[in-house]
Amino acid sequence: VIGAGFGRTGTLSLKEALEKIGYGPCHHMKEVFINADQTEYFYLASMGEKVDWDEVFKDYNSAVDWPAAAYYKELSDKYPDAKVILGMRDANSWYDSASTTIYLMSQNFPKWIRFILPRADKLFKMIDKTVFGEPFSYRFEDRESAIQVFNDHVEEVKRVIPEEKLLMHSAKDGWEPLCAFLDVPVPEEPYPWVNDSKVFA
């Protein structure tokens, strides 16, 4: 399963959901922060280097969130049988959340740490190339521009991925459409609802 949704579209909830229904471990940006190999893989990819996706995802059965979502087209071509899930959220709500959490963190990270820790420098160079810098033309703080990029991404995914391979899913949709799409039983427990905004406060 390939997640094509931007960060802050319920990706952490989707990660937990996929892991509960047999698609774990699920790759997420958290992996890139804690795993040096993952940092290196996605840094190289962001610099235009060819990476071995089989090696990158050898320990995972699904991937959601940035940075993997930035390569959804390449991954869909590499794994033609994989299904694609596009995390959905109201664009204004998404911007409000992203701009006060993950974007703020990426901008406020102490620059001196990047000078003394090479992995941290690579991590934030990757974020610049893959997440908030180039994809948003370095205008993420321009709300209207960022929301346009968000909406354009949604339309691109709908255009690129065949309808039968794509699920547009919001956390509020719960288990039913997700499980029907993946042809797995619906768990009895509630759909995961992970609101990690407080981590960035």
Can you say where each PLM-predicted feature lies in the sequence?
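The conserved 3'-phosphoadenosine-5'-phosphosulfate
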Residues: 31-40, 85-95, 112, 152-201
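PAPS-dependent sulfotransferase catalytic domain
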Residues: 19, 23-24, 31, 47-57, 70, 73-168, ...
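Short active-site oxyanion
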Residues: 1-2, 59-62, 82-83, 163-167
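Hydrophobic/aromatic-rich structural module bridging two neighboring secondary-structure elements via a short loop
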Residues: 52, 56-77, 81-84
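Short His-Asn-centered micro-motif
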Residues: 3-5, 29-30, 64-68, 88-89, ...
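PAPS-dependent sulfotransferase catalytic core
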Residues: 1-58
